[in-house]
Amino acid sequence: MVKIVFSGPPGSGKTTQAKRVAEYYGLKYFSAGSLFREYARRKGVSLEELSRIALEDPSIDLEIDRMTLETVRDSDDIVIDGHLAAWIVSDIVDLKIYVTAPLTLRILRVAGRDNTPLGKALAETLIREYSQRRRFMEYYGIDIYDTSIFDLTINTKLIGVEEAFNIIKSIIDKILKEKHGSMSE
């Protein structure tokens, strides 16, 4: 049984790494961000608009956080991916990984991933990050820029996807060996 959470800002590479880890180890993959995106779709608003709405309506975040926590509690082998997820599930996971990269690189990645002009990607990302930081401080008293809760922080600026995965894999293998023998063998 292993539970791993990936957090970090948009475009950092956290989703890429979380999905790779889930696939490699045969773990369930859960995205808290997909809940937020689905909520936006149901409401017929963009992510940045939902972020603005969530500044005034805490029930949005609280519901997503509740669903994330329940999913992790009810799962044995799972990888969780979310900007703020690590703070929500901190006490019930085996490994907390923070993935980051400089803003310029993250904007380029977001624009490429979403097929969005750079200016729009920058505006949307800044709005989302500001809104998330403010909401989490207000609702939980947590500063998402304080990464001291994480077991591993990895900056993807100078390393590729495979190099980052190998670093993460080495830590996971160590944890699995200590817990109950390696799942990757």
Swiss-Prot record:
<dbReference type="GO" id="GO:0006220">
    <property type="term" value="P:pyrimidine nucleotide metabolic process"/>
</dbReference>
<dbReference type="Pfam" id="PF13189">
    <property type="entry name" value="Cytidylate_kin2"/>
</dbReference>
<dbReference type="InterPro" id="IPR011994">
    <property type="entry name" value="Cytidylate_kinase_dom"/>
</dbReference>
<keyword id="KW-0963">Cytoplasm</keyword>
<keyword id="KW-0067">ATP-binding</keyword>
<keyword id="KW-0547">Nucleotide-binding</keyword>
<dbReference type="GO" id="GO:0005524">
    <property type="term" value="F:ATP binding"/>
</dbReference>
<keyword id="KW-0418">Kinase</keyword>
<protein>
    <recommendedName>
        <fullName>Cytidylate kinase</fullName>
        <ecNumber>2.7.4.25</ecNumber>
    </recommendedName>
</protein>
<dbReference type="GO" id="GO:0036431">
    <property type="term" value="F:dCMP kinase activity"/>
</dbReference>
<dbReference type="InterPro" id="IPR027417">
    <property type="entry name" value="P-loop_NTPase"/>
</dbReference>
<dbReference type="GO" id="GO:0005737">
    <property type="term" value="C:cytoplasm"/>
</dbReference>
<feature type="binding site">
    <location>
        <begin position="8"/>
        <end position="16"/>
    </location>
    <ligand>
        <name>ATP</name>
    </ligand>
</feature>
<keyword id="KW-0808">Transferase</keyword>
<dbReference type="InterPro" id="IPR011892">
    <property type="entry name" value="Cyt_kin_arch"/>
</dbReference>
<dbReference type="GO" id="GO:0036430">
    <property type="term" value="F:CMP kinase activity"/>
</dbReference>
<comment type="similarity">
    <text>Belongs to the cytidylate kinase family. Type 2 subfamily.</text>
</comment>
